[in-house]
A protein has these predicted regions:
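Walker A (P-loop) ATP-phosphate-binding motif of ABC ATPase nucleotide-binding domains
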Residues: 2
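Hydrophobic anchor at the beta1->P-loop junction of P-loop NTPases
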Residues: 5
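The conserved Walker
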Residues: 9
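Conserved lysine of the Walker
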Residues: 13
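Conserved substrate/cofactor phosphate-moiety recognition/catalytic segment
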Residues: 18-63
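Short loop/turn segments at strand-loop or loop-helix junctions that form parts
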Residues: 32-33, 76-79, 118-124
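Glycine-rich phosphate-binding loop used to anchor ATP phosphates in small-molecule kinases
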Residues: 52-112
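A glycine- and Lys/Arg-enriched "phosphate-lid" helix/loop adjacent to the NTP-binding pocket
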Residues: 90-153, 164-167
Length: 182
């Protein structure tokens, strides 16, 4: 199964993928991470992002999904994440309408490479961590979460792809997904 894990920052996507790989060693996850990409290219992200950074991220995520075409792959982020953050930048006037439309089309196109989307929503129980790559602004994180919900609802209506929402402890998330992939 080809799975993409999506959600706002500070929800535990990377931790979930690591936990999943421990339980399911037959799965792989692409080696080049989003965090490494941001550092390597000095990209502006979160509230500071713009078209240039989002274009680099979009291409890297597309390449990762296209190149990792095996049967058992789990992705830590995908073009849905890229679209959501681009859309939030669009709402702040940092991304053009043309760019956001192209991002949305590319996001929809990439769904053909996936069989399942795992959404980890924001939880009030999760401690917000601020670092170079995570924004601690609760209002921004809530906006990102709302945009994820909106686009996932649209995807669920338009595409035959399984969308799973996971919450709870690390162990509960793995247990819940295990029931759905076996």
């Amino acid at each position: 199964m080809r799975i993409a894990v999506v959600g706002a920052q500070n929800v535990g996507k990377t931790t979930f993928v690591a936990d999943f790989l421990l339980k399911y060693p037959e799965y792989i996850s692409p080696k080049v991470s989003y965090k490494e990409l941001v550092e390597k290219h000095g990209l502006k992200i979160n509230q500071e992002t713009g078209e240039e950074s989002q274009a680099v991220i979009m291409q890297a995520l597309w390449d990762s999904i296209e190149k990792n075409s095996g049967e058992n792959v789990i992705f830590d982020r995908c073009l849905i994440d890229n679209y959501v953050y681009s859309y939030c930048a669009y709402l702040k006037g940092k991304v053009s309408p043309e760019f956001i439309e192209a991002s949305k089309e590319k996001m929809f196109e990439h769904l053909k490479f996936l069989e399942m989307i795992v959404f980890i929503p924001v939880s009030v129980a999760v401690e917000i961590q601020s670092d170079k790559q995570r924004d601690a602004d609760r209002n921004f994180i809530d906006l990102v979460n709302r945009v994820f919900v909106e686009i996932l609802l649209e995807i669920s209506k338009r595409f035959p792809i399984k969308i799973v929402v996971l919450s709870g402890s690390r162990e509960e998330r793995i247990k819940d997904l295990s029931r759905m992939i076996v």
